[in-house]
């Protein structure tokens, strides 16, 4: 039912991304371990962030170097498809083979992949800090499970594109967003940037520090972004915020609250048109209880109610008489900012 969070599936994942394809399947990908890595069984709450783990004396990150994909006809039963892409097959491996040869695979990292079906092909984007720094890829391939050949039409234009995300406007123009938040239209067939990037943000403050993406709801462009509730890295809850605009390049409204514990989630619609957002475990300690969470200050360290795995949270999305869009998590555990929230929102 569209009133409470739903735990979809287990398995270590960050930044879960769900895409409803024209073939009737929901596709799931995200930041994951490499296929066959058994470490997650003994370390289910691995942080996935080496620089944080080292400071805390925890085990190294189990993040891998592949895009991995699952699909489902109903969001309930999930089939594992495979690994349609791996970093050693990417554009930067072609440009800097020594970087790949000189760094152990355990230090190769593929973060936050997204996938789209375009003109009979699959288009993937992701970010990667290692073995080539800021080495994001835009990949065109034939299949969502296994591929032998790839196209990289953006080439060098994908360098320094942290957390890339794609958006297709009503006129068919594709836009790339990245790095909270730069945006630029793309040339036909993703052949590069069609114009210089424009910086977009809410009118009152930054949207956040990562995980930016755009949706169009009614006549409004909605920019989503992720930040810690306290405005202090890995302190408090990892939240989702948004702002709206009449033009894709802005100006945008003030930053608004979409949901607690929904940071770097994917807003998507199901087959009934209902809105949901993905959610995942992102904390320095094991998940905390939902009991009384609305009134609990979490500012001591990074904390979440999300179990390891993929959760989806129902969203209320409505358009006012003025055409503006209101978005808020429906489940009470996600619906209100906590006492640790740095921003004060209008009622």
PLM regions and their residue ranges:
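Carbohydrate-active catalytic/glycan-binding domains of CAZyme proteins
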Residues: 1-347
